[in-house]
Amino acid sequence: MFNLLPAFSLGVLLIVMEGRGSAVNTPASRPVTRKSKSYGRSCVEAPSYFWQTPGHLTVLKVPTSRGAAKSQIITNKVDPEHIALLVKNEWKLSYVTPLHHFRHTQLKSYAKHLSAFIVAEKQQGVAVEVGLDAGFKVTFTAVLGLAETDEDAETVFIQIQSKPVFAAAADAPKVVWRGWLTCVNGDPEYLRSLPPDFVSLPLFCTSGPESLTNLVKSWFERAFDCNFGSLALNSSTLNWLAALWTGCHPACNIRYLKLSWSLPTEPPLDVLYTVNPQDAWELWNSIHPQENTDDRIDIKDVQAFMSGMETHFFRHFKIHLSAGTLLKVSTALGSAHHDGKIKIGNSDYITTLLALLTECALLKMPT
């Protein structure tokens, strides 16, 4: 790490790359905005593609401001064992359109159907994972307490267990896949516009073999007439996370702020920019003072924060980071990558992260 004027510490790594390439209720019934056709939901039926037009289409706008990140002891309202399942792991993100006739009261039934579906697909020759037994145990669990509004549906956590082929009879099955669907502070106008037989859990996070992820998605699409898509995180989203997490430093030491850029040079140039957390916060505080009574953060504040760091970097290295693509942001609170991978490092700020990702998922869905 270099001590550079003006009172701003950073570490820089430049890499030149050559040739790289339960008994839970779903949200209360909402006003029906139009009549919907009834579609089957058997796990063996082809999807009806009703997901393309689930009720009146609401134009979702990208917010230009949002509330500052606030710490909350999430374990006061969410089972600590459930929270432990969400933190520390790396999750791959997808969006999913509203689920037709999904019911939180039917989770045990869904677990049985998904387990049978995976076994049937494997027996038909679908590659699952080398070394796994033919039997799979699937569990669906409602994670109560993450929902922030009456319109938010409760989070659903899915876990798949299996035994290795040569495991002893007494050996316990091992967890081979995890995933969860969530909605935190979803756009209320959009959620209210959905017909009453739809549930929106737009953010899908997975950890495990891609083959199992694909099977789980396939089952959901057949069972609930929904559709999945990849969820990449653009530079604007990463900028927001950098600013929101930096603003948390006085209350919770973020330990570091690491930013990774890719620059379109020949050969390509990767830049890892590590900023002292106190210096990053002082820059942020000069733009959005801590004593400000308005806890709303404007996009202009975020842009000024990132511009300040880019300007400081250029002053010393004569490299325009703004010409490249921001790929990753990480602090002790969590990390997020451009390709749609996240890690939750601190549960006290999980609501801020999930609210932003829920927004990204809703904006990415087809209209």
From Swiss-Prot:
Q: Which GO terms describe its cellular component?
A: chromosome, centromeric region; nucleus
Functional summary from the UniProt entry: Probable component of a centromeric complex involved in assembly of kinetochore proteins, mitotic progression and chromosome segregation.
Q: Which residues cross the membrane?
A: none
Alphabetically sorted, this entry's keywords are:
Centromere, Chromosome, Nucleus
Primary localization = nucleus
Q: Where in the cell is it found?
A: Nucleus; Chromosome, Centromere
Keyword Nucleus set for record: yes
Family of the protein in this entry: Belongs to the CENP-L/IML3 family.
For this protein, the record's InterPro entries field holds: CENP-L
Superkingdom field:
Eukaryota
Identification of the protein by name: Centromere protein L
Task: Kindly indicate whether the keyword Metal-binding belongs to this entry.
Answer: no
Q: Which chain positions lie within coiled-coil regions?
A: none
